[in-house]
């Protein structure tokens, strides 16, 4: 059984958002078309941070976006405030067809630790529930797309491999920060 996993296609990652991914909006038509290709399951994720999230540069005196700090023993890039719970920036982009999506998994809700992966927070102490959901649906193969390819998509794909899934990337549906 095969699932499409759509990572963080949210307003704040679009070209006009607070943490823009170049050409992030251009992947949406490709993802919408890909969802129609007979997957057994389609799921999505949302970055869903509290306003006081410690990955935000605004929460650290004399720090700016893209500075690097230690946060709970893990190297953390400080980001501009983005995908704050309940804001327009945290919403999935309006052009993403959400009808085929069976479930949306939110991540990054613990203000003390970031969560790039769709499966775990960055210290791997807490999970999002995605793995259990996929197991319940007998999913063994995952295809990833979304934003950003060099962070949340990559971390999610690597964790999926470590969890035993067969993993592939839908390249037309991915853009990266760097």
Say what each PLM segment does.
Residues 11, 50, 110, 149, ...:
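Short, glycine/acidic-enriched loop or turn micro-motifs at the edges of active sites
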Residues 1-4:
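Extreme N-terminal starter segment of soluble prokaryotic enzymes
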Residues 29-141:
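Active-site alpha/beta core segments
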Residues 17-24, 118-122:
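Short glycine-enriched, charge-decorated loop/helix-capping segments at active-site entrances
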Residues 143-146, 166-178:
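A short glycine-rich beta-strand->turn/loop micro-motif centered on a GG-aromatic cluster
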Residues 7, 46, 171:
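Active-site flanking residues adjacent to catalytic metal/cofactor-binding acidic residues
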Residues 10-16:
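Short acidic, Gly/Ser-rich segments with clustered Asp/Glu that frequently serve as metal-coordination loops
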């Amino acid at each position: 059984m095969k699932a499409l996993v759509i990572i963080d296609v949210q307003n704040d990652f679009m070209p006009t958002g607070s943490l823009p991914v170049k050409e992030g909006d251009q992947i949406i038509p490709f993802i919408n078309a890909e969802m129609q290709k007979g997957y057994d399951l389609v799921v999505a994720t949302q970055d869903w941070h509290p306003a006081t999230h410690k990955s935000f540069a605004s929460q650290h005196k004399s720090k700016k976006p893209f500075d690097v700090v230690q946060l709970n023993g893990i190297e953390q890039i400080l980001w501009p405030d983005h995908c704050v719970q309940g804001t327009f920036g945290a919403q999935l982009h309006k052009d993403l067809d959400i009808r085929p999506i069976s479930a949306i998994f939110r991540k990054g809700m613990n203000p003390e630790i970031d969560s790039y992966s769709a499966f775990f927070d960055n210290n791997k102490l807490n999970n999002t529930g995605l793995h259990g959901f996929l197991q319940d649906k007998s999913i063994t193969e995952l295809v990833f797309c979304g934003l950003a390819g060099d962070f949340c998509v990559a971390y999610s794909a690597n964790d999926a491999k470590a969890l035993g899934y067969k993993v592939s990337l839908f390249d037309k549906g991915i853009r990266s920060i760097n």
